[in-house]
Amino acid sequence: MAHNNNNNINNNNNNNNNNNNNNNKNNNSEYKTNRNLLYKTILNDIENSLQSLIKPQELTNLLEDNINKLKELDGVQPTNTFGNLQNTSTNTTTTTTTTTTTTTTSSPNNNVITPNSNLKQTLSPSVLIEHLNLFGNENFEEGDDEEETSSDSDSSSSSSTSSSSSERVPSKKLKPMAKPRPGGCSICKTQETPYWRKGKDGDKTVYLCNACGLQIYKKKKKEKLSKEKHSIKNVLN
C-alpha cells in the first residue's frame, strides 16, 4: 500500500514539472517577442533622430520609455536613465540646429519653393505609393536621385540624354535648376526645382518637385513609426 502511494506522489511531481516546463517555454517565447519589438522600436527612433525627423529631446523621452519597458520585462525597477541629460538638452538642441544650418547652406536646395503646409493633396493614393516604392528607402536630404538635363541639344543626342538622366549622381553634381516640366509639380505646381521626383498615377507619369517629394517621404515615415509604436503598446498591454 505504501509503495502505491509513493508511485502516485512521483507521478504527480512529474506532471507538475512538465506543466512548469511548458509554462516556461510559453513565457520565454512571449518574452523574446516583446524584447525584439522594443529593440526594433528603439532602433527606429534613433534612425529617425539621425534623419532629423524627431528632435533630440523627443528621442530622449522615447528611449527613456522603451528602456523602462525592457527593465520591466527583466523584472528590474524602472529608473530615470537619462536624468543627467535633461539639464543639457538646451545645449544638445543648439548643437543640432547649428549642424542643420551648415548643411542647408551647402545644399543646392536653397532656391526650392517650399509648398504651403496647408495645401490640399492633389495626388491620388496610387501616386504616393508609387513614389514611395521608387524612393522610400533613400535619404531625400542628400539629393541622391535622378538628374534631369537642362541642355537643349538636337534630336540626334536624345539617346545619350536619356541615358544620363537615369544615372544616380551625388547632389554636388546636380545642375542649379532642372529643366521645367509641363504643368510643373503635381502638388504645388512650381516650375523651379534642382531636380524632379517621378511617380505613376495609373498609366500616367507625374512629377514632384524635390520639396514636395521630401514632404511626402517624411509624412509616410512618421505614419510608419506611429503604427509601430501602437503595435508595441498593444503587445505590452
Curated annotation (Swiss-Prot):
The gene is gtaR. Pfam families: GATA. This is GATA zinc finger domain-containing protein 18. Keywords: Metal-binding, Zinc, Zinc-finger. Residues 1-28, 87-118, 152-167 have a biased composition (Low complexity). The lineage of its organism: Eukaryota, Amoebozoa, Evosea, Eumycetozoa, Dictyostelia. It comes from Dictyostelium discoideum (Social amoeba). A zinc finger (GATA-type) spans 185-212. It comes from the Eukaryota. Residues 1-31, 78-119, 140-186 are annotated as: Disordered.
